[in-house]
């Protein structure tokens, strides 16, 4: 967890900072707030004018500081055009500071001080979750917490919003017991007491957040951004159970992001008191409370019924069985009975084949085209009533009475088994689909193919693996990665990226290796492949591929890369064309090696060689055709004469 002093936050963003005397809105008793007219108020300000210090601080602001516009802040400080007097003791309105350069809103993760407590200089006031991390918010002056205006767990609090009130004297705390920000900021004071009976109306909102104040000291663990493009995630699995002790660094849960499944670690010690999001819950927005952690094991039972408002709309994935048809279609042990209702086969029909049905049910059946002989009645004496029509699900094999015999197989009427299966789209699969579509629609692909004689590589590989016996083995793919990296150094245009306004030519070669996983395709990266040896590359590839298949890759291990390799040769594919991984400019598709007859200077005039076909997909905006051909020539040279990789 990061901790930042408000003084540093103040320097980074002049518009906010707790304890900064010119940024906390200090209101003196009896001091009128007058809106300056066309800047005239600034001209009339003197050192004796109430709020002069605040105005003087504002005078030093400029648009370059990226602070809040001057007229907007003046309006916040001075209030409405009408005069108003405050009967409250001197106090400071503490705004939410900007704790990161890109922060626009924050979440109050936890209040470290309670109302009435003394706050010493340097003490932690609250923990605020920004767009980057959870940051400790410290005081830079001594004061007392008079009123907390934003409850724990409140999300998307705008930067600059008033979050609490502090006073200089402990005897002034009581005056703010019933203080609300709306009542103090209202333009017309007499109108404020009138709607006070309506104050219970907003009470449901605090009641949803009330757990933060009425429960023992605890911390809400919110869903963080585990990748730069992540907007929501899926809770794949909880690694800890309620009541278990958590140590710093322990794996708490596995979260499926838009890139991969990533382990979510605990940042501090405690006990897991409540799991708020069950396993399998999909599309959980960032910042949603996932669980509750307490410091003391004795506090765990207090959170048995804890349920914040943020998670009420989140539901785990619905089970595949359809609830309504399951009741009227029980499994029939007697296949002789035509209708699915085996318990009372003769109930719907009378002595002469008459069907007992209520007038309303008969009308509804006619409108819906339902054959009443197939409906089981649940009314008196087996009479069909409206409820039976509403809950009836016709079977597919119901055109004739004879065809009604097959349905007793399973109780799933709407979707016959064996026709198709709907597989939910994971976040990873959705992102893969979006990026592939974007690549094909926006990148002008062209393709170059070449055959490579792999005879020398196979001989060198055999010798090296003998030397490494008992250690890791070098594969043909490792030679391909090394040759690709060296070819990128020779032809740097292929190791470039299209950045809309510029073409970025990379000076290091990070090879992305396509790996197929149960969740979808992912491309872990062999960093600095151009300076690594074959053994190091082999170890990296094995480690990354294992992590990818187990869903344990960290974001930095698969985000980035300057050149991609996709190898389908192990499946017997001779050649194929791969889709470029933006913003990269090239991807190399590797086919299988096969023995071919090639011309040779010997008595027979030919020889048998192991030939491999490769296809280079290029972005024509970055790599021209001749440049792509030059890269393939360098690549083939390194593989057909692997000793040149040492140069």
Curated annotation (Swiss-Prot):
The modification N6-acetyllysine is found at residue 466. Binds 2 lipoyl cofactors covalently. Belongs to the 2-oxoacid dehydrogenase family. One of its GO terms (molecular function) is pyruvate dehydrogenase (NAD+) activity. Residues 91-167, 218-294 form the Lipoyl-binding domain. Its EC number is 2.3.1.12. The modification Phosphoserine is found at residue 100. NCBIfam families: PDHac_trf_mito. The gene is DLAT. It is an enzyme of class 2 (transferase). Residues 356-393 form the Peripheral subunit-binding (PSBD) domain. This is Dihydrolipoyllysine-residue acetyltransferase component of pyruvate dehydrogenase complex. Residues 184-216, 311-352 are annotated as: Disordered. Residues 1-86 form a transit peptide. The modification N6-succinyllysine is found at residues 473, 547. It comes from Bos taurus (Bovine). InterPro entries: 2-oxoA_DH_lipoyl-BS, 2-oxoacid_DH_actylTfrase, Biotin_lipoyl, CAT-like_dom_sf, E2/Pdx1, E3-bd_dom_sf, LAT1, PSBD. The active site is at residues 620, 624. Residues 187-205, 316-348 have a biased composition (Pro residues). GO terms for cellular component: mitochondrial matrix; pyruvate dehydrogenase complex. The lineage of its organism: Eukaryota, Metazoa, Chordata, Craniata, Vertebrata. Its cofactor is (R)-lipoate. It is found in: Mitochondrion matrix. Delipoylated at Lys-132 and Lys-259 by SIRT4, delipoylation decreases the PHD complex activity. It holds the Pfam family Biotin_lipoyl. As part of the pyruvate dehydrogenase complex, catalyzes the transfers of an acetyl group to a lipoic acid moiety. The pyruvate dehydrogenase complex, catalyzes the overall conversion of pyruvate to acetyl-CoA and CO(2), and thereby links cytoplasmic glycolysis and the mitochondrial tricarboxylic acid (TCA) cycle.
């Amino acid at each position: 967890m990061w901790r930042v002093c408000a003084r540093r936050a103040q320097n980074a963003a002049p518009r906010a900072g707790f304890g900064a005397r010119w940024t906390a809105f200090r209101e003196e008793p009896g001091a009128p707030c007058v809106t300056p007219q066309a800047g005239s108020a600034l001209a009339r300000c003197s050192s004796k004018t109430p709020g002069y210090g605040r105005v003087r601080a504002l005078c030093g602001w400029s648009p370059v500081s990226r602070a809040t516009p001057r007229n907007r802040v003046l309006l916040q400080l001075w209030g409405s055009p009408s005069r108003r007097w405050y009967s409250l003791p001197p106090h400071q309105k503490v705004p939410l500071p900007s704790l990161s350069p890109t922060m626009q809103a924050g979440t109050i993760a936890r209040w470290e001080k309670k109302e009435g407590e003394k706050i010493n200089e340097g003490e932690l006031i609250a923990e605020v979750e920004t767009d980057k991390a959870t940051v400790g918010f410290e005081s830079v002056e001594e004061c007392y917490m008079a009123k907390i205006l934003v409850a724990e767990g409140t999300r998307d609090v705008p930067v600059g919003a008033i979050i609490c009130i502090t006073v200089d004297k402990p005897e002034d705390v009581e005056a703010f017991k019933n203080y609300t920000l709306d009542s103090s900021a209202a333009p017309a004071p007499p109108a404020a007491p009138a709607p006070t009976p309506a104050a219970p109306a907003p009470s449901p909102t605090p009641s949803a957040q009330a757990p933060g104040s009425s429960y023992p000291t605890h911390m809400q663990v919110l869903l963080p951004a585990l990748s730069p493009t992540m907007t929501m995630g899926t809770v794949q699995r909880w690694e800890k159970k309620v009541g278990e002790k958590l140590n710093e660094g322990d794996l708490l849960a596995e979260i499926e992001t838009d890139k991969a499944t990533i382990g979510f670690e605990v940042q501090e010690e405690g006990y897991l008191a409540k799991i708020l999001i069950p396993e399998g819950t999909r599309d959980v927005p960032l910042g949603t409370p996932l669980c509750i952690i307490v410091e003391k094991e004795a506090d765990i039972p207090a959170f048995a019924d804890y349920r914040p408002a943020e998670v009420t709309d989140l539901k785990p994935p619905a089970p595949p069985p359809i609830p309504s048809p399951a009741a009227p279609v029980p499994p029939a042990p007697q296949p002789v009975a035509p209708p699915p209702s085996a318990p009372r086969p003769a109930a719907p029909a009378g002595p002469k084949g008459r069907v007992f049905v209520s007038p309303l049910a008969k009308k509804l059946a006619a409108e819906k085209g339902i054959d009443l002989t197939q409906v089981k009645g649940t009314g008196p004496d087996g009479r069909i009533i409206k409820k039976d029509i509403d809950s009836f699900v016709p079977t597919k094999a119901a055109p004739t009475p004879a065809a009604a015999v097959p349905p007793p197989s399973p109780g799933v009427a709407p979707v016959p088994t064996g026709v198709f299966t709907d597989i939910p789209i994971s976040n990873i699969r959705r992102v893969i689909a979006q990026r592939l579509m974007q690549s094909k629609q926006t990148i002008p692909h062209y393709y170059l193919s070449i055959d490579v004689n792999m005879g020398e590589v196979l001989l060198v590989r055999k010798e090296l693996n003998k030397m490494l016996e008992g250690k890791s083995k070098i594969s043909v793919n490792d030679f391909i990665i090394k040759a690709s990296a060296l070819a990128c150094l020779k032809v740097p245009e292929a190791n470039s990226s299209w950045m809309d306004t510029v073409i970025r030519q990379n000076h290091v070669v990070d090879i992305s290796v396509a790996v197929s996983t149960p969740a979808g395709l992912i491309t872990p990266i062999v960093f600095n492949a151009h300076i690594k040896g074959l053994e190091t590359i082999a170890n990296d590839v094995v480690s990354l591929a294992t992590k990818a298949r187990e869903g344990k890759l960290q974001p930095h291990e698969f985000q980035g890369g300057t050149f991609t390799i996709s190898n389908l040769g192990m499946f017997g594919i001779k050649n194929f064309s791969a889709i470029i991984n933006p913003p990269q400019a090239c991807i190399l598709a590797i086919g299988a090696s096969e023995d071919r007859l090639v011309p040779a200077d010997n008595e027979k005039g030919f020889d048998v060689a192991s030939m491999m076909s490769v296809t280079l997909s290029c972005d024509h905006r970055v790599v021209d055709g001749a440049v792509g051909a030059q890269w393939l020539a360098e690549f083939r040279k390194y593989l057909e004469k692997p000793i040149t990789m040492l140069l």
